[in-house]
Amino acid sequence: AACILLFPRFLLTAVMLWLLDFLCIRKKMLTMPTAEEAAGAGEGPPPDDPPVCVSDSNRMFTLESLKAVWHGQKLDFFKSAHVGSPAPNPEVIQLDGQKRLRILDFARGKRPLILNFGSCTUPPFMARLRSFRRLAADFVDIADFLLVYIEEAHPSDGWVSSDAAYSIPKHQCLQDRLRAAQLMREGAPDCPLAVDTMDNASSAAYGAYFERLYVIQEEKVMYQGGRGPEGYKISELRTWLDQYKTRLQSPGAVVIQV
């Protein structure tokens, strides 16, 4: 029954991937920044969600890409995390000291806990990691932040992307995942980082593959970002945190959740 419900969305995504292999369509749908825009990028703060660039050499419609899409959509369908529901509390491994903890162990009192799931081979995630660091610095006084390293989005022995920051094969053991997470640590040295277990318990509970954002507060899911790449938006999370901060400062204010 689940397969029947999932198939229309999967088929639509498959057709989209097939169309994106035609470069004329790809160039229209995935716009690249112009030279003028790139030159003016240094003026003012950079955007929270820089555009995702897909090189012409990348094949979008392959057996491996279809496997990855099906896997991600299946995890999203069966996830247990939903806005307003109790937050799943799977086991993770803290990168520092390799101590086994649970997601909610990183929460502190009534402060929101921001979860950012992703991997080093996910171009949108890595492109927005700097934005996430800025966000964490802006709201460190009211919220806590946790990066969770999950299975690779574009492993070198799977759906390969030439735009990936690193060439990393599928994790065969926990040490593989911990080594990959060390690379992410280099890009976000000031943010707590944990890795998913080898049975991908966190990714499954939160439907996190390819990448995803969540806000947990008092053991409840308060915000659930869309599935990456298209639904992965740091700007949307910033809006939620801005509204939350306004509510803290003005208890009578009306807050519209994103």
Curated annotation (Swiss-Prot):
Signal peptide: none annotated. Keywords: Cell membrane, Endosome, Membrane, Oxidoreductase, Selenocysteine, Signal-anchor, Thyroid hormones biosynthesis, Transmembrane, Transmembrane helix. It catalyses: 3,3',5'-triiodo-L-thyronine + iodide + A + H(+) = L-thyroxine + AH2; 3,3'-diiodo-L-thyronine + iodide + A + H(+) = 3,3',5-triiodo-L-thyronine + AH2; 3-iodo-L-thyronine + iodide + A + H(+) = 3,5-diiodo-L-thyronine + AH2; L-thyronine + iodide + A + H(+) = 3-iodo-L-thyronine + AH2. GO terms for cellular component: endosome membrane; plasma membrane. The keyword Oxidoreductase applies. It is found in: Cell membrane; Endosome membrane. GO terms for molecular function: thyroxine 5'-deiodinase activity; thyroxine 5-deiodinase activity. One of its GO terms (biological process) is hormone biosynthetic process. It comes from the Eukaryota. It is a single-pass type II membrane protein. SUPFAM superfamilies: Thioredoxin-like. The chain crosses the membrane at residues 1-20. Residues 21-258 are extracellular. It is an enzyme of class 1 (oxidoreductase). Its EC number is 1.21.99.3. The active site is at 122. PROSITE patterns: T4_DEIODINASE (PS01205). PANTHER family: IODOTHYRONINE DEIODINASE (PTHR11781), THYROXINE 5-DEIODINASE (PTHR11781:SF4). Monomer. Homodimer. May undergo minor heretodimerization with DIO1 and DIO2. Plays a crucial role in the metabolism of thyroid hormones (TH) and has specific roles in TH activation and inactivation by deiodination. Catalyzes the deiodination of L-thyroxine (T4) to 3,3',5'-triiodothyronine (rT3) and 3,5,3'-triiodothyronine (T3) to 3,3'-diiodothyronine (3,3'-T2) via inner-ring deiodination (IRD). Catalyzes the deiodination of rT3 to 3',5'-diiodothyronine (3',5'-T2), 3,3'-T2 to 3'-monoiodothyronine (3'-T1) and 3,5-diiodothyronine (3,5-T2) to 3-monoiodothyronine (3-T1) via IRD. Catalyzes the deiodination of 3-T1 to L-thyronine (T0) via outer-ring deiodination (ORD). Belongs to the iodothyronine deiodinase family. This is Thyroxine 5-deiodinase. The lineage of its organism: Eukaryota, Metazoa, Chordata, Craniata, Vertebrata. The gene is DIO3.
